[in-house]
Amino acid sequence: QQYSFIIKRLFEFAVKDLFVINNVHSGVISANIVLPMAFRIDSENNGVKGDLPVSLLETTILDNEDLKILRNIIEEINTVLYTIIPGLRIEIKEYGSQLMDNGEEGHKIELMSSREGMPSFPIRMESEGIIKIISILNALIQAFSDPSICLAIDELDAGIFEYILGELLQIFDESAKGQLIFTSHNLRALEMLEKESIMFSTTNSSNQYIHMKNIKQSNNLRDVYLRSITLGGQKEEIYKETSSLKIARAFRRAGRCVKNNE
């Protein structure tokens, strides 16, 4: 009975409070296909959590419930978005009603970018980084304000301007109530977060994640990491050494093969 209670609580946590945003989420944005909007909407009776896909290729047809959810998402993210991207707000352009495949009435919509002093234009014309921020912003708002939320994002930095990434990480590090777990290749995170909050991947599959050792308060963690790549000094190898000469030689060989095959 005790274990069933624990399992039930874990299930409730996963359904309500756990967000996992993987590379597929980012991939459909990079391919300019779909904007998957991660969200959680709370209400008096019940809450809703999930991904609401909005097409980047054409208009999207939503039923009444999904349109209501989208309006709530846009209202929440616009509160924050214009401070991250100055002057930017998102609008829902409605083109009228259209029957859905199940025979119910749907609403044909398109997401538009609205900037001060400029005509609105389709959101697909924005950069990949801005679209990604929009897609995860509701989830970030939830994690920032709710201590029960755990938000995990694979490759948070992908497509996002380095300075904006640093600003977001600093704000979360200083003020967030929930938990943000993410992977990143961008070293900006090393300058914005406390060393205790960062783990590094290694080349040892049996001990794949470690904390850096011998880090002083005055050390720049980014410099320590780069130095550890070239000189070592950590308990595990964090980068398999490569040779720029061998890489250049391989490129030359490949170039000769291309010419010989022409």
Name these PLM-found stretches:
Residues Q1-I133, L231-E237, R253, C257-E262:
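Phosphate-coordinating catalytic segments in nucleotide- and nucleic-acid-processing enzymes
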Residues I73, E105-Y239, C257:
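Switch/communication elements of ASCE P-loop NTPase nucleotide-binding domains
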Residues E241-G255:
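Conserved AAA+ ATPase small/helical "lid" subdomain
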